[in-house]
Amino acid sequence: ADNNYRFTRELCEWCLRNDVRFIYASSGATYGDGSLGYSDDDAVTPTLAPLNMYGYSKHMFDLWALRQQVLNDIVGLKFFNVYGPREDHKGDMRSVVNKAYGQIQHEGVVKLFKSYHPDYKDGEQVRDFVYVKDAVNACLWFAENRRVSGLFNIGTGTCRTWVDLARAVFAAMGRPPNIEFIDMPEHLRGKY
């Protein structure tokens, strides 16, 4: 939480004092379960309820920036589910695409968590998956367009199911889909 709140705040304050463009990574995780929608309007920000410490720490900085009235001078980017090359160093925090690729390569099967939410069948849980190069292009656009400031969502704007994503990885690897549903660990339930 220190990295995502205190250190980000200190860096932001330094940038503001020294007239340096400040663009920071917030997260789609700040939206919690999505029941309040995904509007990046400032008026919605105080009402959000993240589900985990990561989302909460990102949300705390968004709230600080809003309350300090500095969102007119900085840019916050709420990245959704970014995937792409060179993720192995992220361990358990790698994208589902990266995990699926490894599972298919080594085991020939993708293991997805069963749904514990009554509105979603197993594998029908949805996320907005955005390719890392598209996320980088968004960052570069904001770096080049200094007149633009505020809090912005960075995603495709379209949700896909876990099953759709797994099938796409199988197709990209030229293999038939083989998906197994496993129980979600208790400590993760209600957190994602």
Residue ranges and their predicted role:
Residues F22-S26, V75-N81, D128, N153-I154:
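Structural signature of the Rossmann-like NAD(P)-dependent dehydrogenase/reductase core
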Residues E87-D92, K191-Y192:
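Short, solvent-exposed loop/turn segments at secondary-structure boundaries
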Residues D33, A49-F80, K99-H106:
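Active-site Tyr-X1-5-Lys
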Residues R9-L51, V75:
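Conserved Rossmann-fold NAD(P)-dependent oxidoreductase catalytic core, especially the SDR/UDP-sugar
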Residues T30-Y31, V82-G84, A135:
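Conserved sequence/active-site signature of Rossmann-fold short-chain dehydrogenase/reductase
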Residues D2, P50-H59, K90-N98, D128-F129, ...:
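Short-chain dehydrogenase/reductase
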Residues I104-Y192:
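C-terminal substrate-binding subdomain of Rossmann-fold SDR/epimerase-dehydratase oxidoreductases
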